[in-house]
A protein has these predicted regions:
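An acidic/histidine-cluster motif and surrounding catalytic segment
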Residues: 147
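Loop-rich catalytic cores of soluble enzymes, especially ATP-dependent carboxylate-amine ligases
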Residues: 122, 152-236
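Detector for methionine-enriched segments
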Residues: 1, 83, 102, 140, ...
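Short strand->helix junction
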Residues: 76-79, 150, 154
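Terminal catalytic/cofactor-binding subdomain
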Residues: 2-143, 235
């Protein structure tokens, strides 16, 4: 059953999303790190100072919370190239962090830190996120690794997504690293997944058969004021 009625060509035209296809398979990686105090192991809201010391670097980004530094790769041809790209940035960044009495921490959540003690990064997009998501948004004390894959044609996107969703439980089991929350054992191997899905535009993607269905979904989300931009959809 199609989610985009074929009888609405005008709506289809308005919903169209330009697809930036990749002439060959590529990948890029975004890796979120928490900053933790070397002595207490609690989170440290020092990302602004760390990024300032690193200087202008397109491979280092701020994130929603000021306890987080994101390291990103460029567009790479293979996994080995992406890993080396990340290492080249991570080495100097780690040294700066250690010189400031902190360590880089990588897990889905922090085992005991309190979300209410964390500071938000001052940026319009993050302010809008909190405005829309309120209490749940302020609790997003989570980190992850995002892999972007270049695909030649929009027609290939949904079949690939469907195939990946069939293996979602396996991928989650392999990457789960967040059983603790606020000092308590949650009983879940990935409490990060449980927290993230509370946001209305996060969690698992819907099942679309065609790219046009996804375009229609994004159009409706914008039309109803749920999102302003497509990148506000943050599916796992």
């Amino acid at each position: 059953m199609s989610l985009v009625p074929a009888s609405l060509p005008a709506r289809r035209s308005a919903a169209r999303i330009d697809f930036a296809g990749s002439p060959r398979p590529t990948l890029g990686v975004e890796w979120e790190f928490a900053l933790v105090d070397s002595q207490t192991r609690d989170l440290s809201n020092e990302a602004t100072a760390v990024i300032a010391e690193i200087g202008e670097n397109p491979r280092v980004h701020k994130e929603l919370l000021r306890n987080t530094v994101e390291i990103v790769s460029g567009i790479c041809e293979c996994t080995a190239e992406a890993m080396q790209d990340l290492r080249d940035t991570l080495g100097p960044a780690r040294q700066i962090v250690r010189d400031r009495g902190m360590e880089l921490f990588c897990a889905g959540t922090h085992p005991f830190a309190r979300w209410s003690a964390q500071k938000l990064t001052d940026a319009p997009r993050y302010a809008e996120l909190i405005k829309r998501t309120q209490w749940w948004g302020r609790q997003m004390l989570i980190w992850g690794v995002h892999v972007h894959v270049g695909i030649r044609s929009a027609h290939k996107v949904m079949p690939i997504m469907t195939s990946l969703l069939n293996y979602y439980p396996h991928l989650l089991a392999l990457s789960a690293s967040s059983p603790w929350w606020g000092g308590e054992d949650t009983g879940y191997a990935s409490n990060r997944a449980m927290m993230f899905q509370q946001l209305p535009t996060a969690g698992l993607p819907f099942h679309f058969q065609r790219w046009a269905e996804f375009e229609g979904f994004v159009y409706d989300q914008k039309k109803t004021g749920i999102i302003d931009h497509m990148d506000e959809i943050r599916w796992d």
